[in-house]
């Protein structure tokens, strides 16, 4: 028996490791533009407002792609859809490295916007895909930690790739970032096909592990069970309306929008803030981004562990999820303190504190695994992500305007800090009890 228990614990961690690597790459590719932004804007003559719009191109497409992406996942399963996703987003990233061959600034701006838009479209199934795979491979009591791990890949990406990209810009040129990061992704897309299967179709899974996952509430077919395609197709607007009229779900959605305002500040304007406002070199900025990212990473893992531990200690799911979220968001507001300090060290310290908090409170995906109606996990994840990433449209553009009208980042940081407060209030006052949402079926 000891042998089976020892070996029934392996395969799902390999799957999780793969998701983690791909998600790191996903965020690395999102961040390429922010690291290249300072030299690029100088070389190509792009102003703050325009750059804000180019930064937002990714999120426009990412948001538009959420619902169709969720639908594709529910129809074809994560393995195939995700492969196409990785391959395409990497290809478009490589092409961005050639955008400067179009001569005139106007043409370059259009090409940049279009290519970033395509990267966003291609990346849109990634997180709902992660969610589908984790729901398939992990029993409920391990899901918070599993979701926290793939979620924290976003910070890990910065820890690894930001110094590397800063170095590339300093040593080679800004185009090289896109070629190398994109090339890496194309290679990884084929590795993905070798590694990822659903639990029922996995070539080397131990039956004991499969039973363990199944008994613990894992949805082991991973959207590949052909018999329930009949039920799956009929997603109506009435269903979406039901999801949006739930006070609990709406609170979770709005909070996610606010939490992501911090994420998108970090993914777009943060390196520019360090270079232009705080006068660091690009290389320094690449390394300076590591500390906040590392803190976000640690916070993210801790938040998931604390939350799952509270559930094991028989606290309610509501308490176990909300406590880390509310504490974390409270810490996030410290981003505003950066306006009142001058030394590089102090700035990095308060940014790091804010990101530790944001990571610790980023349990949105775990909460979604707890509340999404069984019939519509892909779609609920898509809606959740739609709200979350609308922040990626709003934040870069608004901050672009704030910088261009006030000439500094002060109000930008206040704008971001206020969002942490709103998210906190959503969980405190609006969400209520966290439980699985029951669809009222139109049939009966």
Predicted regions and their residues:
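Extracytoplasmic gate region of multi-pass secondary transporters
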Residues: 33-37, 241-301, 361, 365, ...
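Juxtamembrane intracellular "pre-TM" segments in multi-pass secondary transporters
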Residues: 2-8, 201-251, 277
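C-terminal transmembrane helical hairpin of 12-TM major facilitator-type secondary transporters
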Residues: 318-364
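Cytoplasmic helix-loop-helix junction between adjacent transmembrane helices
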Residues: 115-155
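Helix-loop-helix hairpin linking two adjacent transmembrane segments in secondary transporters
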Residues: 150-203
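Central cavity-lining transmembrane alpha-helices of secondary-active solute carriers
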Residues: 56-71, 290-303
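C-terminal ends and interior cores of transmembrane alpha-helices
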Residues: 87-105, 330-342
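Hydrophobic core of transmembrane alpha-helices in multi-pass small-molecule transporters
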Residues: 92, 107-124, 345-359
């Amino acid at each position: 028996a000891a042998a089976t228990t020892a070996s029934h614990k392996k395969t799902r961690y390999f799957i999780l490791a793969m998701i983690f690597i791909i998600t790191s790459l996903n965020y690395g590719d999102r961040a390429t533009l922010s690291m290249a932004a300072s030299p690029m804007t100088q070389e190509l003559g792009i102003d703050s407002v325009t750059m804000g719009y180019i930064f937002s191109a990714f999120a426009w497409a990412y948001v538009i792609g959420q619902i169709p992406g969720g639908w594709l996942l529910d129809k074809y399963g994560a393995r195939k859809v995700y492969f196409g996703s990785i391959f395409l987003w990497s290809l478009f990233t490589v092409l961005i490295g050639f955008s400067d061959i179009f001569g005139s600034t106007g043409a370059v701006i259009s090409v940049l916007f279009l290519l970033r838009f395509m990267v966003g479209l291609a990346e849109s199934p990634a997180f709902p895909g992660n969610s589908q795979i984790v729901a398939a491979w992990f029993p409920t009591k391990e899901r918070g930690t599993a979701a926290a791990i793939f979620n924290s890949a976003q910070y890990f990406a910065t820890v690894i790739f930001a110094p590397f990209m800063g170095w590339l810009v300093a040593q080679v040129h800004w185009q090289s970032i896109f070629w190398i990061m994109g090339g890496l992704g194309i290679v990884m897309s084929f590795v993905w096909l070798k590694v990822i299967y659903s639990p029922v179709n996995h070539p080397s899974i131990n039956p004991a592990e499969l039973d363990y996952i199944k008994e613990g509430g894992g949805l082991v077919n991973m959207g590949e069970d052909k018999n329930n395609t009949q039920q799956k197709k009929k997603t109506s607007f009435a269903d979406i309306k039901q999801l949006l009229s739930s006070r609990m779900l709406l609170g979770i959605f709005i909070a996610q929008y606010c939490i992501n305002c911090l994420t998108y500040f970090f993914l777009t304007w943060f390196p520019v803030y360090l270079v232009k406002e705080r006068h660091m070199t690009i290389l320094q900025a690449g390394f300076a981004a590591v500390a906040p990212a590392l803190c976000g990473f640690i916070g993210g893992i801790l938040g998931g562990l604390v939350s799952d531990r509270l559930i094991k200690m028989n606290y309610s799911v509501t308490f176990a999820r909300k406590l880390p979220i509310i504490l974390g968001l409270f810490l996030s507001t410290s981003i505003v303190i950066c306006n009142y300090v001058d030394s590089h060290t102090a700035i990095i310290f308060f940014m790091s504190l804010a990101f530790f908090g944001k990571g610790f409170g980023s349990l949105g995906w775990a909460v979604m695994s707890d509340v999404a109606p069984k019939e519509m996990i892909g779609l609920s994840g898509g809606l959740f992500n739609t709200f979350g990433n609308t922040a990626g449209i709003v934040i870069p553009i608004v901050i672009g305007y704030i910088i261009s009208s006030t000439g500094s980042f002060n109000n930008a940081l206040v704008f971001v800090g206020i969002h942490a407060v709103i998210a906190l209030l959503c969980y405190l006052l609006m969400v209520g009890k966290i439980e699985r949402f029951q669809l009222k079926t139109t049939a009966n």
